A protein has these predicted regions:
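Short linear loop/turn motifs
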Residues: 126, 249-253, 279
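Conserved NTP-handling cores and scaffolds of large molecular machines
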Residues: 101, 218, 241, 279, ...
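ABC transporter nucleotide-binding domains
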Residues: 2-4, 9-182, 187-201
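C-terminal coupling/interaction segments
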Residues: 256-301
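Short, flexible turn/loop "capping" segments at secondary-structure junctions
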Residues: 49, 72, 214-217, 245-246, ...
Length: 301
């Protein structure tokens, strides 16, 4: 379990993380979302003792990282896959980590097999592609078989098969009762992987909840309907007090259900060619909830 209590980090006059409090529970995959500059990496660095909080605390099973007697056996992390000695082989990089943390050498070959890079074990780490470097970083995180795992953008550089593999791995690790805390900018992938979300903006907590609750809270489903009598149907729906958006071939009806729209159409003998519920996606909910917290915004034109 990871607990953040009023976690705050200032860099000069800039507040990167602002009184952040939440709990990352074991047994589920918790996604960590926020716009660029929101404070995600800084938060992870404070959890791992790489940055000191200005105030507040970040603890792993009740202890700060610096209080852990066997850190690699307590928490594993992937923050930057390129942080390796470029001239060491893949296997020797992991053997060095194992030796300095009193981890049996046999564990090195186990994690190499687990992440699918046994075939490049003798290759210099500095020559690996980004995708292979990510796999090596994940292997390093798993080396101590820790109960708590943090991954910062673990699917960067991975092909579709690799992304699917990471998704399966995260869910397997959580299913074993571990705490899995993972950040990603690929929201479609996060919606397939995460059980819970921690969402921040400008260093402040926006939400700490399940994926389903977050999506439901940040946007209601709409109903899409097509009919050969579109104008008449629109008038019926508006007269019923519903909010309706019109496109050339369909209507989008807000804050209602397919049952309600279907009953109104039937009552007025209006044929329907399509009647479907359009669920809010995680991406739509995320953009809605973080719109005011975006630090870096590009121009559309």
């Amino acid at each position: 379990m990871i607990e953040l209590r009023d976690l705050t980090k200032n860099y000069g006059t800039t507040r990167a993380v602002d009184s952040l409090s939440c709990t990352i529970e074991p047994g589920v995959v918790t996604g960590f979302l926020g716009p660029n500059g929101a404070g995600k990496t800084t938060t992870m660095r404070m959890i791992l003792g790489l940055d000191h909080p200005t105030s507040g605390s970040a603890t792993i099973d009740g202890r700060t990282y610096r209080q852990l007697t066997d850190p690699l056996r307590s928490v594993g992390a992937l923050l930057d896959a390129r942080q390796v000695h470029p001239n060491r082989s893949v296997r020797n990089h992991l053997r060095w980590m194992a030796a300095t943390n009193r981890i049996p050498r046999r564990r090195v070959d186990e994690v190499l097999e687990m992440v699918g890079i046994s075939s490049v074990a003798g290759v210099r780490a500095g020559t690996l592609s980004l995708g292979m470097s990510q796999r090596l970083g994940i292997a390093a995180a798993l080396l101590g078989d820790p109960p708590v795992l943090l991954f910062d953008e673990p699917v960067n550089g991975l092909d579709p098969e690799g992304i699917h593999w990471v998704r399966t791995l995260m869910r397997t690790l959580a299913g074993e009762g571990r705490t899995v805390f993972v950040s990603s900018h690929l929201l479609s992938e996060m919606s397939n992987t995460a059980d819970r979300l921690v969402v921040i903006g400008r260093g402040r907590l926006i939400a700490s909840t399940t994926v389903g609750e977050f999506v439901s809270r940040c946007g209601a489903a709409t109903v899409r309907v097509r009919s050969p009598h579109l104008e008449q149907l629109r008038a019926v729906l508006v007269d019923a007090g519903l909010t309706v958006d019109t496109t050339p071939d369909a209507l989008t009806v807000h804050d209602t259900s397919t049952d309600a729209v279907g009953e109104l159409a039937a009552r007025h003998s209006l044929a329907l060619h399509e009647l479907s519920s359009q669920e809010v996606s995680l991406e739509q909910a995320y953009l809605s909830s973080t719109d005011d917290a975006t630090v870096y915004r590009g121009s559309a034109g």
